[in-house]
């Protein structure tokens, strides 16, 4: 995902 904040 390019804009993934969740790890």
Curated annotation (Swiss-Prot):
One of its GO terms (molecular function) is toxin activity. Expressed by the venom duct. It comes from the Eukaryota. Occurs in 2 forms, vil-I' contains 4-hydroxyproline at Pro-2, vil-I'(O2P) contains unmodified proline at Pro-2. The keyword Membrane does not apply. It is found in: Secreted. One of its GO terms (cellular component) is extracellular region. The modification 4-hydroxyproline is found at residue 2. The modification D-allo-isoleucine is found at residue 5. The keyword Secreted applies. Its main location: secreted. Keywords: D-amino acid, Hydroxylation, Neurotoxin, Secreted, Toxin. Belongs to the conophan family. The mature peptide does not contain cysteine residue. May act as a neurotoxin. This is Conophan vil-I'/vil-I'(O2P). It comes from Conus villepinii.
